Swiss-Prot record:
It comes from the Bacteria. This is Ribosomal RNA small subunit methyltransferase H 1. Specifically methylates the N4 position of cytidine in position 1402 (C1402) of 16S rRNA. The keyword rRNA processing applies. It is an enzyme of class 2 (transferase). Belongs to the methyltransferase superfamily. RsmH family. The keyword Nuclease does not apply. Its main location: cytoplasm. Its EC number is 2.1.1.199.
Amino acid sequence: MADQNINKNEKVLTGQPTENQEPVHKRRERYKGTHPKTFKEKYKERQPEKYADTIEKVIQKGSTPAGMHISICVNEILEFLQIKPGQKGLDATLGYGGHTREMLKCLESQGHMYALDVDPIEIVKTRERLQNLGFGPEILTIKQLNFANIDEVVEEAGLFDFVLADLGVSSMQIDDPDRGFSFKTDGPLDLRLNPEKGISAAERLKTISQTELQGMLLENSDEPYSEEISKAIVNEIKRGNEIDTTTKLRDLISKVLVTIPENEQKEAIKKTCQRTFQALRIDVNNEYEVLYSFLEKLPNVLAKGGRVAILTFHSGEDRLVKKSFKNLQRAGIYSEVSDDVIRPSAEECNRNPRARSTKMRWAIKA
């Protein structure tokens, strides 16, 4: 009997219902401040349809609302693609669906679009978002597929009149700490675009040699401190300390750069973290191999006179796209390619700082 009373008291103390007691109603935690900082606190920003005023205020400040992605170079893309009603198009990187939505508007309910994405989390949200805007399966086909496999889509769809590939990571992926893309917030060191496939960045670091890691940092992000960072990471893991969170990697990089003059240290750590995370993301997602495959197959999915625009966000991607377009133009496969990159306007960069590193290149099928 005494034991039963103890158990009953324990239940009361822990908030669990006793046998003759109704379950305790727990209110959800509410953010009490006026300036939400964490991803979870920014619940209004993650519901743009419900809190349009909040979204507009965030954008006006030059920030990207949490859980959203502001499409880049929309006007430049549409001006080049010259989409006409009745055409067939492909958005090879669906993401938040902003570019797809604008291209669908150009079709004026005539023709069809296909859109691809590897992210199983965001693709569900984007499909629903576009469906609610009136873009259902009669005008839009969405597939969870890596854009390296565009040849599989053309078997079903036929040749495309226009293709877009935006190679950037979407803001909603970067901003969600659970995805582990950003060094600014604590989260698992994952960096996979599809968390259901492959190994995380944390797992990758457990098995990589110093030489291989240094080479990765150089090739994927031109990291000037590649030797020091790779040595520190490998030594830390050899000591039995896992680097399995974004914060652990950021703190280790900070220690490596401790000898940099104090007035330069903060910016140096920020830039080095950006480059290191980028290099790891490219590696775990095989981004260069995927891009090689896409560029190689691209001419075979374009109709005669078909147009393709590609947005890149770092020099490694841009070099691959430029080289492919120029080589295929010399081979007579493309009739025209962009001589130079197209960049977002200063106004767009002020409105959306994440657009600053964007470069756009285009090609037309002969």
